[in-house]
Amino acid sequence: MAEESSKAVKYYTLEEIQKHNNSKSTWLILHYKVYDLTKFLEEHPGGEEVLREQAGGDATENFEDVGHSTDARELSKTFIIGELHPDDRSKITKPSESIITTIDSNPSWWTNWLIPAISALFVALIYHLYTSEN
């Protein structure tokens, strides 16, 4: 007999997932899928602390930032227990566009000219004092 491929999807609310945020029950969300990683904590190559920090919440951004291998992605599928309920998907923070604080691209004149000029004068003064002693 063929395995039933159209199993009903088990949905979990965000509130329910957030309760599983400890070493006895470690759940997290990746791409709206819910994973129970409790039994994988000690086997995780990055250490169990990494998973426990993300437990009970959405770890999608951190998971993608690490750049997991194809093998790791395949292994992760074995821990899927369901999906985040569609009503709660808007509640998790999507990876925000990072706010980058930039320094003015046109720095003031003193950083471009005054500091190098003072440095050059200082070097010239030291050179002059050094050569006048001989």
Curated annotation (Swiss-Prot):
Protein location: Endoplasmic reticulum membrane; Microsome membrane
Keyword Endoplasmic reticulum: yes
Record PROSITE patterns: CYTOCHROME_B5_1, CYTOCHROME_B5_2
Principal location listed in the UniProt entry: endoplasmic reticulum
Pfam families per the UniProt record, alphabetical: Cyt-b5
GO cellular component: endoplasmic reticulum membrane; intracellular membrane-bounded organelle
Gene3D superfamilies documented for this protein: Cytochrome b5-like heme/steroid binding domain
Annotated heme binding sites: 44, 68
Transmembrane domains' residue ranges: 109-131
Gene Ontology MF annotations: heme binding; metal ion binding
Topology within the bilayer: Single-pass membrane protein
The protein, known as: Cytochrome b5
Organism from which the protein derives: Bos taurus (Bovine)
Classification lineage: Eukaryota, Metazoa, Chordata, Craniata, Vertebrata
